[in-house]
């Protein structure tokens, strides 16, 4: 039974009044800050530079400091930090000296989830899209969920929102094992892949055990929703001592997809569920990986009693998430135009999924990728996979690695990647020097009908809007909101 919308009583955190975020502009921090502002807390935060994110929070009443200084935290009752913050940060040092609690962002998220029906989405890939789909379907079902997402939900114009119902939908971050703070009622595991292995001391078995531990944070009456198509998820399934529902393309899955048809940006498929009528579904996203994300959403929505009509409406009306195969528009070139796409994918599995989606939706079009590796350690650890996957583009331009605070690692840079990809003999990648303007470099390489993807988790995210505004692409047509 879907509950009626009632304003949910909002619990208070004891003596806590003023909450300070160190690195408030970060994608994992700003959403929690926004929800706390809407709950009536005083929120302040610091970051190295102002941004549209910090300006948005400021407009809601947050006090924003540019730069990290000890005095910024002086009046806080608690500091919230991410794993990216150095323990020597002056604000953290001041808080510790004054015995002001310093908590990880996941612990604050867990506090928000404590008195709610929490739905936590975990997995190496697909967390943001699945969480966003859930928010869309729950809203279509007459629920008004609180959500905290690692990307900007296009329809809401934000990555977080305070709802009136008991539901809180959030991403569960395995990168620093902080998802172990969460105690949800429903947990999703989309997949388990080798990433952030420094957290797990390079031990993949430790990573798998941590996911099992996360699932055992569920109460005995909770629900684990697990992707049966992922071999590692399938492997840990017998270890999970909680009620489970599986999904995937596998005939063994409780909820599965058949008859998948992709037409450009739209994917249509039939959903089979045990003891239910088949359900015809469409999503405005390409690729089988997004079918899996939709199946996880359908599994939870079905369990929560959301009607099939609302499920179909929430999925078909979903307008996407920022930087997840986000179509910016059309760039004019001789004889026609090029579709410009921005994408966050920064792991070989994610890059491969995007390439497969493009080949499936636009089989006759060339694929031009501007790729920026993210972190030297990831480039080193997954080097051979990157060489294999990136070599499947028709044209490849490689930006230098975005360090994300890391020091360079010999042999794990983009020049070396170019060399290794070139040696495969399939294509000759172009290395982009730091500071080089992209538009003059990429325009001569483009042909009418191409798909140009700017991909990665670093500052490559600013390239698509730059290209749309470049005089070399005068007359570029912005993608209209759906």
From Swiss-Prot:
It is an enzyme of class 6 (ligase). Cell wall formation. Coiled coil: none annotated. Pfam families: Mur_ligase, Mur_ligase_C, Mur_ligase_M. Its EC number is 6.3.2.8. One of its GO terms (cellular component) is cytoplasm. It comes from Pseudomonas putida (strain ATCC 700007 / DSM 6899 / JCM 31910 / BCRC 17059 / LMG 24140 / F1). It comes from the Bacteria. It is found in: Cytoplasm. This is UDP-N-acetylmuramate--L-alanine ligase.
């Amino acid at each position: 039974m879907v509950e009626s919308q009632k304003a949910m009583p909002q619990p208070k955190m004891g003596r806590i009044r003023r909450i300070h975020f160190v690195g408030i502009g970060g994608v994992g921090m700003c959403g929690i800050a926004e929800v706390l502002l809407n709950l009536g807390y005083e929120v302040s935060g610091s970051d190295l530079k102002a941004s549209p994110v910090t300006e948005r929070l400021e407009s809601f009443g947050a006090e924003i400091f540019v730069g990290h200084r000890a005095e910024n935290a002086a009046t806080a009752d608690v500091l919230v930090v991410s794993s990216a913050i150095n323990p020597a940060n002056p604000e953290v040092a001041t808080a510790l000296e004054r015995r002001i609690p310093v908590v990880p962002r996941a612990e604050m998220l867990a506090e928000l989830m404590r008195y709610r029906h929490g739905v936590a989405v975990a997995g190496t890939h697909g967390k943001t899209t699945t969480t966003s789909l859930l928010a869309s379907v729950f809203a279509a079902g007459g629920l008004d969920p609180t959500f905290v997402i690692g990307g900007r939900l296009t329809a809401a114009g934000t990555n977080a929102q305070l709802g009136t119902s008991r539901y809180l939908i959030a991403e569960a971050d395995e990168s620093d094992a902080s998802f172990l703070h969460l105690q949800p009622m429903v947990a999703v595991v989309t997949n388990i892949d080798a990433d952030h292995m420094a957290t797990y001391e390079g031990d993949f078995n430790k990573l798998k055990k941590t996911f099992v531990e996360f699932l055992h944070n569920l109460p005995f009456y909770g629900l684990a929703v697990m992707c049966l198509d992922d071999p590692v998820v399938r492997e840990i399934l017998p270890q999970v001592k909680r009620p489970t529902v599986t999904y995937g393309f596998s005939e063994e899955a409780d909820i599965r997809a058949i008859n998948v048809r992709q037409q450009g940006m739209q994917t249509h498929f039939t959903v089979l569920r045990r003891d239910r009528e088949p359900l015809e579904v469409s999503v405005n996203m390409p690729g089988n990986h997004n079918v899996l994300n939709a199946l996880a959403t359908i599994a939870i929505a079905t369990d929560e009693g959301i009607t099939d009509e609302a499920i179909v409406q929430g999925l078909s009306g979903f307008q996407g998430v920022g930087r997840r195969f986000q179509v910016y528009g059309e760039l004019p070139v001789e004889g026609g135009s090029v579709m410009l796409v921005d994408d966050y994918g920064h792991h070989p599995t994610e890059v491969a999924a995007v390439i497969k989606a493009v080949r499936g939706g636009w089989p006759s079009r060339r694929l031009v990728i501007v790729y920026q590796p993210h972190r030297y350690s990831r480039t080193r650890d997954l080097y051979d996979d990157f060489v294999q996957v990136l070599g499947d583009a028709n044209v490849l331009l490689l930006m230098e690695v975005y360090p994300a605070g890391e020091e360079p690692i010999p042999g794990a840079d983009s020049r070396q990647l170019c060399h290794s990809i070139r040696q495969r003999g399939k294509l000759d990648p172009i290395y982009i020097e730091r500071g080089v303007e992209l538009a003059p470099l990429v325009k001569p390489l483009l042909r009418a009908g191409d798909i140009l993807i700017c991909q990665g988790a670093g500052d490559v995210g600013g390239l698509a809007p730059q290209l749309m505004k470049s005089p070399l692409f005068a007359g570029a047509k912005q993608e209209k909101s759906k």
